[in-house]
Amino acid sequence: MDRSGTAVAILSITTPGFWFGERNEVRKVVRECNEYTAKLRSDHPGRFGSFASIPITDTEGALKEIEYALDTLKADGIGLYSDYGDIWLGDAKLAPVYEELNRLKAVVYVHPIEGNCCRNIVKDVADTVVEYGADTTRTIASLIFSGTTTRYPDTTWIFSHAGGMMPFVIERFVSGTEVEIVPGIVTKGQGSNPPQKVPKGALYELRKMYYDTAQATNPVAMRALRTVVPVSQIVYGTDYWYRSAAETSRGLTTNKVFNDEELRAINRGNAERILPRYRA
């Protein structure tokens, strides 16, 4: 961290996650991981934060862990995966958890994982190459089209990898949630979800969310993202150890997408607004 100029690192758990297995064992492993990251924070004051894990498909266990992680361990937020087997994040089963997170005005970070639907479907192509971006996009769509982000407006969402493929399918997000009036014709949302679930439209919901730069500093990806959302919604992320902070910083400074003021906001300022206790 010192070599790369990283002042604070926010820790979270990546694949394969915790959702599978016997309920009590899952709760135990989740608790151990959260307590480990809390110890890292206490051992290195001011250098580490954490997005705590929860067993989200176990409602009782999830609610207990939210209380423990945020109240006792003082975690900075909650870390989720883009799907849990065949459940994406807009699923109605998760409503009790979202009600509590919204009440707490929690920060929720989402990292992708491959869904049951889509493992090893293209020969010689690792799931991380295509499916992580696709699954991030699926779960963003699930949250918006289900009306979840509308019902729980006080939750702050952060998605990894520049939102996956979302910037490139933005036209479909918009046309699927907004009412377009053509002479004599009213076109409603293209999906099974009526526009009234998303009364302000998909673009409004997308622009409330935050997106990190992990493995997405390529100029094509960054230009696409900043076309959809303002720079204020982009935060620094590395995917360490899969990608180093040095590589990420080099990508951001050489892609010629952002000026110096915008880079300062991405590198620190925007995150400080979400997590004010780390303000310099």
Spans of features found by a protein language model:
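Short glycine-enriched, charge-decorated loop/helix-capping segments at active-site entrances
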Residues: R23-R27, D127, G251-T254
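Mid-to-C-terminal alpha-helical segments outside catalytic/metal-binding sites
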Residues: M1-V8, E35-S42, K64-Y68, D76, ...
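Mid-domain alpha/beta scaffold segments of enzyme catalytic cores
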Residues: M1-Y84, A92-K93
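Catalytic pocket-lining loop regions of alpha/beta-barrel enzymes
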Residues: L70-Q233
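Residue-level preference for long, well-ordered alpha-helices that form the structural scaffold
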Residues: V26-C33, D58, G90, G133, ...
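Short glycine-enriched loops at secondary-structure junctions
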Residues: I56, P112-N116, Y240-Y242
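Short beta-strand segments
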Residues: I10-S12, S53, F159-H161, Y210-T213, ...
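Short catalytic/ligand-binding loop motif for oxyanion handling, primarily in non-cytosolic enzymes
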Residues: I10, G17-E22, T59-A62, A69, ...
